[in-house]
């Protein structure tokens, strides 16, 4: 995901054709070729104050919310967004922006101190998209430390957010057991890093428009139905093939 922005997904009941408005990321017209996907948003303080009830009414079925970055940064809007999404009945997840220059275990503890997960929340997310000038092997080792630390502490297997072009050049293998949230804009289907055979979430636009959110917001798909999403939240199991 872009360092400045959040992520979004919306629920669409049936497949629709790609149009000019869809290309711009309108929520109601974003293409869902198989009609069996959920749409949602992911956000940070860059989206400003959000009317989560309006967003829910516009079809937001889940939201990823920026919580932390590095070893000490907390997104200024995290608390408001975390509470607002829950109050509007939107399944929520928190993400950490990984900084390879900072100790991975310290980053994991910072996230765990900041985010209190409860029943009905999405799994934690690690956003992996920058190198900070660190070597690939060091980045991969640190990412593994963060994922394992957070999974042990929460009992939830984290989601990995990345894009294929970054992951392929930096990370190597051995991460395919973690659910994938992949970023790829302007494509009928996203490119997927070699570690994975399918995606759970797909960020397909960074220029979406959603009621209750001022300006652009990232749009995302979940590769399944509402029942699939609830099963994923409850068990961590993901069996729907996009």
Residue ranges and their predicted role:
Residues 2-13:
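Bacterial N-terminal signal peptides that target proteins for export
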Residues 23-24:
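N-terminal Sec signal peptide cleavage junction
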Residues 30-44, 48, 53, 175-242:
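Functionally critical loop-and-helix segments that line ligand-binding/catalytic clefts
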Residues 36-53, 65-156:
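Substrate-binding cleft of extracellular glycoside hydrolase catalytic domains
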Residues 59, 67, 86-89, 115-119, ...:
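Sec/Tat-exported extracytoplasmic proteins
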Residues 93-95, 125, 159-161, 181, ...:
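Structural detector of well-ordered beta-strand residues that form the stable sheet scaffold
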Residues 103-104, 166-176:
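Glycine-rich, charge-decorated loop segments at or immediately adjacent to ligand/cofactor-binding or catalytic sites
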Residues 155-168:
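Aromatic-lined carbohydrate-recognition surfaces of secreted/lumenal glycan-active proteins
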